[in-house]
């Protein structure tokens, strides 16, 4: 009998975490990624990681790499602060809905601030031979005589596998083929995201009250501004000297993720928004904040122009149960959600841990892999789709975007 082989489409956080969990259990796994290299495209900004995420990452990473991850992460004051457009504080936002269900590891706090690009480089280190770049996945074929699945790319097949796992995001071609009934909807919110370098110069002008887990200011007209700082907890740790140069460079800088958000009906149309230069986007945000407190306008003035980009906020719509096969999905390919609760990455990492353990258990027991997939999918339909619904509800209240029950048409803008 041929060796059991797993293919993962997508080398994001969930895909690499799942791959490493399987690899540590001795399972043959290959990851196929559309990008030309691990650092050919900036892989996102700061993300909130809770105990669901840290539990999965602790399972995936060898002890040395776990120490790197912790040293490169931030351990902020865990308050979530709310202000009006005049920078007057309101009640602290309850962060219990953003907590995980894992076991916080090594006395680290429930909430971490993590750079997505740094975490991805950490997961990739030492795993290079299992990740294949330059493969844009277009779908798959079922191979009837072997029961395997053939993974297809723009350049043809990359091989036959016993299990295919889509981890390639909201635009997943695998999910579109596997679950064509699942819709991606536009939540009716437009974002302009940017990094704010946290240097001695910027810290001298930025408000101290923003230095918490997460802060949001909003007016009565559907406009908001968020701020989430990342101060690396131990960037000088000697262990960093044994890491690749790209990873060392990543951890040298602290920054904040700042997002200007506005409801789509109050924003310029998409063609105009997505054609703007970085400085035009900054100017547009400042114009819409013309009456705001100077302390908040300062945040936008400190945006790093090289990182400014417009985004469309989108979500999946949960669907009824389906029968399992040897093709399944994790992360945004299955349950992309509003960013309002900050649990999207954590839900994806929970998927990686949940599915990984079920695959490992099935291989150890000699039980059918489809049973493992079915058990995982039944579970993820509960917690994953609950997260989609909860994030949409909170986003409707906090950001002002549509709830998934009322959201409109599909949108291909932004990721």
Where are these regions (language model features)?
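C-terminal helical "tail/cap" subdomain of flavin- and related membrane-associated enzymes
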Residues: 2-4, 66-71, 79-94, 98, ...
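Glycine-rich FAD pyrophosphate-binding loop
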Residues: 23-43
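FAD-binding beta-loop-beta segment adjacent to the flavin cofactor pocket
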Residues: 310-330, 335
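Conserved FAD/dinucleotide-binding core of flavoprotein oxidoreductases
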Residues: 88-115, 193-301
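Beta1/beta-strand and adjacent pyrophosphate-binding region of the FAD-binding site
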Residues: 2-14
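Conserved N-terminal glycine-rich FAD pyrophosphate-binding loop of Rossmann-like flavoproteins
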Residues: 36-56
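Conserved N-terminal helical subregion
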Residues: 2-4, 50-197, 279-282, 286
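Conserved Rossmann-like nucleotide-cofactor binding loop
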Residues: 14, 37, 171
């Amino acid at each position: 009998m041929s060796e059991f082989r797993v293919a993962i489409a997508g080398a994001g956080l969930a895909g690499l975490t799942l791959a490493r969990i399987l690899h540590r259990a001795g399972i043959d796994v290959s990851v196929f990624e559309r990008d030309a290299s691990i650092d050919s495209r900036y892989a996102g900004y700061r993300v909130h990681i809770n105990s669901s995420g840290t539990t999965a990452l602790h399972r995936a990473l060898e002890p040395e790499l776990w120490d790197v991850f912790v040293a490169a992460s931030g351990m902020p004051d865990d308050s979530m602060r709310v202000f009006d457009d005049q920078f007057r504080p309101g009640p602290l936002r309850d962060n219990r809905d953003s907590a995980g269900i894992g076991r916080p590891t090594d006395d680290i706090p429930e909430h971490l601030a993590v750079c997505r690009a740094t975490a991805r480089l950490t997961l990739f280190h030492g795993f290079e031979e299992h990740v294949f770049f330059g493969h844009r996945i277009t779908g798959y074929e079922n191979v009837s005589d072997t029961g395997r699945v053939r993974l297809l790319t723009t350049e043809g097949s990359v091989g036959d596998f016993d299990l295919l796992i889509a981890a390639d995001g909201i635009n997943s071609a695998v999910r579109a083929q596997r679950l064509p009934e699942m819709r991606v909807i536009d939540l009716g919110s437009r974002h302009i995201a940017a990094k704010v370098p946290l240097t001695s110069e910027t810290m001298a002008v930025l408000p101290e009250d923003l230095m918490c887990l997460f802060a949001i200011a909003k007016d009565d007209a559907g406009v908001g501004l968020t701020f989430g700082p990342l101060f690396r907890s131990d960037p000088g740790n000697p262990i960093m000297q044994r890491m690749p140069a790209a990873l060392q460079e990543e951890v040298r800088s602290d920054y904040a993720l700042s997002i200007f958000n506005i409801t789509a009906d109050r924003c310029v149309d998409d063609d105009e928004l997505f054609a703007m230069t970085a400085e035009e986007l900054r100017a547009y945000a400042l114009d819409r904040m013309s009456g705001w407190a100077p302390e908040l306008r300062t945040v936008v003035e400190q945006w790093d122009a090289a990182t400014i980009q417009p985004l469309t906020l989108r979500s999946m719509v949960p669907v009824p149960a389906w029968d399992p096969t040897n093709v399944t999905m994790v992360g945004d390919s299955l349950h992309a959600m509003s960013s309002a609760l900050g649990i999207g990455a954590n839900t994806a990492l929970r998927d990686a841990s949940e599915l990984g353990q079920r695959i490992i258990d099935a291989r150890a027991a000699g039980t059918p892999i489809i049973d493992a997939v079915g058990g995982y999918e039944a579970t993820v339909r509960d917690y994953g789709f609950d997260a989609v619904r909860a994030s949409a509800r909170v986003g409707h209240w906090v950001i002002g975007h549509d709830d998934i029950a009322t959201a409109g048409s599909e949108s291909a803008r932004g990721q």
